[in-house]
Amino acid sequence: MVKLRDISTIAVSESTHNFEVFSGLEGVSDTVANLKSENVEINVLGHNPGSLNILIDASPHFRDEKALSDCFGPQMGGVVYDSYDRMVMKNGRIENYPDTEIPTLDVTPLNVDRSLTPKQKENRNKCKKLFDHLLLEIQRGKITAGCVDDYFAFMHAAYCVLSKVYLPRFKYKHFEISSRLVTIHECNNNTKPSLFWSNRDDESHDYMTIIQMMVQVFSNAMTKYATSHLINEYHNDLDSPTSDILTKVVDELKDIDIEPATYATIVYLWLTGEDEIEDLDVLAVIFDECRSDGFVDNLLVRMLPPCEGASLTSEAIDTGLLYTRNDGYMVYTASMVEEDVNKMEYDRRYGLPLMEFRATNSLVTLRVDYTTKTNKQMKVQLMINKFPKFELMNTDIFSSQYLMLGKNIVIDMIKMTGHMLRGNVQSANLDTQRKLSNLVSSSHPWITRLVANRARDDVHIRFASHMITDLDNLTKREHPKTIFVESLKMLDHFGKSERYELLVYLSAADF
């Protein structure tokens, strides 16, 4: 879990663009008009991890244009050098950029519409200004290499949720969405997604392309949420100066908790939504304590995969609400319950969780049950009067889908850990283990439940357990990378090509 301030820059600008969608709303039109007359708005600008990585790597050479060109090429090296030069460093102080709590930047989130058509030219100058601000934060020590490594690990966890849980739905015809998204889910299979094709240097950038898309869509969604929050505060407090209201709203935004599954869900909701106001009502369910039952229903239903002809049922329970969709082969359940519920009991009743995140004292979970039986199987069971009992500790009953997920988590955990420890092995400690465990709990909660129940018969689950519970051993080894190499010897079910791929990754990783 991270704070919104850790993954984005929350700034104000002299503009009224963000208020346009709210102008016609009944009851707040006068408030919106008054705010527009103030000519000030809030923007949430998600950080591009690629840009942060470049700036961190370039930080020792900011004043050496030749060294920057040698490291990053003449074009990117020139961009970094020019950005540094604009800050006019004098006597170790940054004269032209006062260190204020709320930065003022003439920058809005990249203009990406619902069809995800990039409009790079009109935003190029704005991108440079945000680039300047990030470089400034690095110079002030507010963004460090450790922060960037943790952010990369976080974004990889969010990418895992989006690519494995949500994006596969776009290959079906249930969404009226641009064909640009149809092949994104195939990135893991080395096919070419068409998303932001013009922004890529070459075909190897599929992964970072999707990360870039996530950052842009998340920024759009959170900027609209920040605008609605500002309107509500201004509407309810007409006596306070606008500057005080701005400060209050920005401070509240900075402290919003974001988990990988939260991030991915917001991106998915914003991509598939048809009305921004309705989408904001759903976001309010995640971030605000006051919730409308109808908005909770909308959130849970939209989290379920859209299946034509599949039955949809709701169930009010003591601890919250859940929706179930049964397509005859699998049963998906989306629930919002009290945070202190017995998770294991829900897992036994509704299946293992695919993802999970907290929403203001509540727990939102998407589960899938692969144990649905066909009519023929049910008839056989009725004839012999024997019903198999689903035991969480018994991994033998898992379908091949779980073994596939087990292999995926091995690769995902290695990459998340590699991001966290890049060039900083000596700092690997229990805090690193805690961060990794939290990322996995949100993006792959089913594996942590199995580990907690000692379900380690499957080789992949044993490896994941090893990664989760024994990461502190990294601090006790002269060569921490060996813990991964030794663990790979357990993966008997991996093919030669998969084993080779992992070993190559480990050899190249800067542990």
From Swiss-Prot:
This is Movement protein. One of its GO terms (biological process) is transport of virus in host, cell to cell. Its main location: host cell. Coiled coil: none annotated. It is found in: Host cell junction, Host plasmodesma; Host cytoplasm. One of its GO terms (cellular component) is host cell cytoplasm. Transports viral genome to neighboring plant cells directly through plasmosdesmata, without any budding. The movement protein allows efficient cell to cell propagation, by bypassing the host cell wall barrier. Signal peptide: none annotated. Keywords: Host cell junction, Host cytoplasm, Transport, Viral movement protein.
